[in-house]
Amino acid sequence: MSRDELGAWLRLILTPGIGPVSAYELLRVFGHVKALFEASPAALRLVVSPRQTESLLQAPPLWDGLLSRTLAWLDAATPQQHRAVITLGDPLYPSAFLNLDDPPLLIHALGAPAAFAALQNPKTLAVVGSRNPTPAGLDNAFAFSQHLAEKGVLIVSGLARGIDGAAHRGALQGSHSQGAPVGTAATLAFVGTGLDQVYPQAHRELAQRIAQQGLLISEYPLGTPPLASNFPKRNRLISAFSQGVLVVEAGLPSGSLVTARLSMEQGKEVFAIPGSIHSPASRGCHALIKQGAKLVEKAQDILDELPHLLPVLPLLQVASPASGSLSEAPPPFSETSTEKFSEPFTDGLKPTDPDQAVLAALGYEVVDLDTLQARCGWATPALQAALMRLELSDQIAPLGGGFFQRRGLA
């Protein structure tokens, strides 16, 4: 893509009053994005309103700055990590998006060169859920994603706190397992900001790892902040790109339920992991199961329902964006990731005091002492002291054999 063509695409997405429907009609009539900006006012008025015509004739005030910023973002390329601005009609543009009523005019992509083939990979599963999960929810998201990635399934999520982060981590772990397909993308993250930003900041190292072994994707221009309105739009791309969606844990309401609803409307399979009837974090999954989502207890349940997810074709012989074509990328972040696959994580868990931390780690399950210790990361004396306080205050019940459960769950 030339500089002029990139500039025309960026100008189109910045033009006030030109939404997806108008933009697609303009492209259909004029055939090329540069041609519509070279058209006469009279020709434009045959396609769009006079006010929209006036907008198209005036360069948006932020356009020059965005073009320079995007060119700089693209020009700092290395062979290890590529960047690309992929527009509607480009061979790399995900064909799955064409089924949307409002496919993005362009996407930004950043990641490992071989991973760009994943943009046309039909063997994908979205794993989504709460930003404030229980410990069991985090464990399930990680374990399901790890197992599926080991089998070659491409895990898709949104880089959010909680379940999303655990799903990406599990996929990264699974892609390193013995027997996992070689040369495949580990995971794809669809984000709700420009790709020159990371949200949440706590996932900066995770984003680094995804950029090294998978792809980060955004339809938003560089510099776009994490606006609340961006994330429901992002969810439509997750559902469109995936063959099915697994909701690990979700309350009511939840953005992950939006993704599940979109998937149902698109005829995709929706899976949900059940939880305790006492847990608010499980109510969204239970609602989905009532509406026809498939209850799953293990990752193999998903593979049994979607056998076509296996095997994933290797991505070793794939052409990635070439240097000098506005499509190669350097590492997006300067520091080197030091996150270890084996480290415990508590993404989204923020208890307010020690006893509440133990209750959060206990969740709504029957949990043994070793698991509690691993989740809390405490020395045994401190954990046992907290358990004693909770038992004396009638908040938990010892079940014998080193197992504990919250009280009031009868």
Positions of predicted regions on the chain:
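Glycine-biased, small-residue-rich flexible motifs in mid-sequence functional cores and linkers
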Residues: 1-5, 87-410
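Short, small/acidic-rich helices and loops at N termini and domain boundaries
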Residues: 1-92, 369, 393-395, 400-402, ...
